[in-house]
Amino acid sequence: MGSGTSTQHHFAFQNAERAFKAAALIQRWYRRYVARLEMRRRCTWSIFQSIEYAGQQDQVKLHDFFSYLMDHFIPSSHNDRDFLTRIFTEDRFAQDSEMKKCSDYESIEVPDSYTGPRLSFPLLPDHATALVEAFRLKQQLHARYVLNLLYETKKHLVQLPNINRVSTCYSEEITVCGDLHGQLDDLIFIFYKNGLPSPERSYVFNGDFVDRGKDSVEILMILFAFMLVYPKEFHLNRGNHEDHMVNLRYGFTKEVMNKYKVHGKEILRTLQDVFCWLPLATLIDEKVLILHGGVSDITDLELLDKIERSKIVSTMRCKTRQKSEKQMEEKRRANQKSSAQGPIPWFLPESRSLPSSPLRLGSYKAQKTSRSSSIPCSGSLDGRELSRQVRSSVELELERCRQQAGLLVTGEKEEPSRSASEADSEAGELRKPTQEEWRQVVDILWSDPMAQEGCKANTIRGGGCYFGPDVTQQLLQKYNMQFLIRSHECKPEGYEFCHNRKVLTIFSASNYYEVGSNRGAYVKLGPALTPHIVQYQANKVTHTLTMRQRISRVEESALRALREKLFAHSSDLLSEFKKHDADKVGLITLSDWAAAVESVLHLGLPWRMLRPQLVNSSADNMLEYKSWLKNLAKEQLSRENIQSSLLETLYRNRSNLETIFRIIDSDHSGFISLDEFRQTWKLFSSHMNIDITDDCICDLARSIDFNKDGHIDINEFLEAFRLVEKSCPEGDASECPQATNAKDSGCSSPGAH
């Protein structure tokens, strides 16, 4: 008996030991599996973020380029000054005129066939709820109601301070939501899960309502409607995408014009004014600061509270180059003597030609001719006559135009015929934000937190700063606050704490990069101000996918975008690969491949980890780079029936070209008029120190107008660019037939191809 019992215990112990080892082995395998998935997820995330931030850098550089052209362009007529004012300056007079025009929304008829939601003011809760339901059913709000709602929204916003103060004493809880970026499903899901706004349920939406998603208009209408219904319980902060210059690139401008073709221009101009009246921050119980981006080491809440926020129409520029008339005159004379000796910003090459990126104009060159041959309609003036007019003119209308074009500063000598009160009134209206005020706003809208101490420029985004835990702690102590809530960054889980839990990032657009890429989140605060975070994914497809399927789907999308990026820089990559191929055998090591790719793309990605997904493995760890580039081209050409070199150029420049098109199309008509083209080309030719006749510019415009309807649309604009690239495959104007002809004829035309 004893022996049998002992044997049974021995076998039981062996079985238990074997089971324990098996469990440990399975656990080790599973942990490795999860670790590999996590590594893939992080690499995928890095790809999406790097490409997104690279696009933001391009936008900033492109706008800096146009701003530089404006600063060094000498207007030769009233038309040129007005054109600059329309495109580049913050035209308060035009906006006020447009608002008066929009107040006449009653003149817009709503047809009997219209089946969408109807609004009457003052709005009631049922109106706002009906809007949510109508947009859920894919109905569209009529332009009359859109303009009416925007007009009422502006009337409400102008009464609000720069920093809203709200309290948890008057509601059970306050819900803070982050970026929505035009994703209506997320907003509807938040209201479904958390409840519609009410006196007991307050909301703060922390900016970036628009761009990228397809339902930005609908989101704005819902948010504005609830803000009018519950002005004390529903609050909005401005984000960096509530900016008409940013909207030109990221889709909102295009969305409005597609949905409201007749009244789209009025809606966009009104929205531009509404955006600049949005509050900059919200303070809960004087303890929790909510702003879109972050803070910096110079953030001053007292100064932010006093800024005339409506003057900062766009954070992409600061029109505070306050120079005296004498300084402006000296600048004009210097430019007239030799524009080639003028200062060249960091984003332009040493030669005075336009850079190959973001814009290549190929061979649009012409023989230098006199400005006196301008067409009569331009009313051209030489530089000396313009200077004389700037010095001597005392007419109010001319002064206003010069103010808007940035040629004078407020506070100069007033005309004798005007009273001091009138002058002060006009000065207040035309006052531009100072550099300090502008930077305060840029920092709170564009900045990101970092783990290191200190504060440094945000070179990744191209605007704002990176702020460390010490900067956060300093601000919280200065104003006796507990923590800071910000948005601005997509997070895998929809939220993230940092800086010892003193900074909370909330991002409410789920599936932002791709279905399954990230969760959305919002945070609820009660009287104790303890953050309660709720996560979600609005897309039902994600609930049916396993973790591996979800990561694989997102990874595939990210790698596809990365291959497009690599293909767009094929020529640059080939040149860089050749530097590592000293023996000219067409082979480089995989380590050299990774170094070369990073030196060209500057994305900061873990290329060695991504290599297996991008490069076929080889036994000797060598890569035949020409065949690899050829395979990249085949992958893209399978989707596009365009020559490889031309497709590469379009992939690299399309976003910038579309943005340039919308900048030139200052009236948002969807077309560039011949006059807009002429004036813009004079801007370029002035920068490149090329005198070109207006007749030649008009011939060029007509040649781009392929269908001869008197306007240039986006397809014609891109096609002209493609043809120029086709005739100049290496971007060398000297090898282009057009450049040769230009020397003889004084103008060039893509239509000749």
From Swiss-Prot:
GO biological process: cellular response to hydrogen peroxide; detection of stimulus involved in sensory perception; negative regulation of apoptotic signaling pathway; negative regulation of MAPK cascade; protein dephosphorylation; visual perception
Residues that coordinate or bind Ca(2+) 2: 705, 707, 709, 711, 716
Localisation: Cytoplasm; Cell projection, Cilium, Photoreceptor outer segment; Photoreceptor inner segment
One of the record's GO cellular component terms: photoreceptor outer segment
Biased composition (Basic and acidic residues): 322-333
Primary location group: cytoplasm
UniProt-annotated stretches for the region Catalytic: 128-540
Keyword Manganese listed: yes
Positions with a binding annotation for Mn(2+) 1: 179, 181, 208
Tissue expression remark: Retinal specific.
Region feature (Disordered): 318-382, 409-435, 732-753
PROSITE patterns with a match to the protein in the record: EF_HAND_1, EF_HAND_2, SER_THR_PHOSPHATASE
Enzyme Commission number: 3.1.3.16
Keyword flag Calcium: yes
Requisite cofactors: Mn(2+)
Any matching Pfam family: EF-hand_7
Residue span(s) of domain IQ: 21-46
Domain of life: Eukaryota
GO molecular function terms noted in the UniProt entry: calcium ion binding; Hsp70 protein binding; Hsp90 protein binding; iron ion binding; manganese ion binding; mitogen-activated protein kinase kinase kinase binding; protein serine/threonine kinase inhibitor activity; protein serine/threonine phosphatase activity
The family this protein is said to belong to: Belongs to the PPP phosphatase family.
Function as written in the Swiss-Prot or TrEMBL entry: May play a role in phototransduction. May dephosphorylate photoactivated rhodopsin. May function as a calcium sensing regulator of ionic currents, energy production or synaptic transmission.
Record-given protein name: Serine/threonine-protein phosphatase with EF-hands 2
Protein's organism: Homo sapiens (Human)
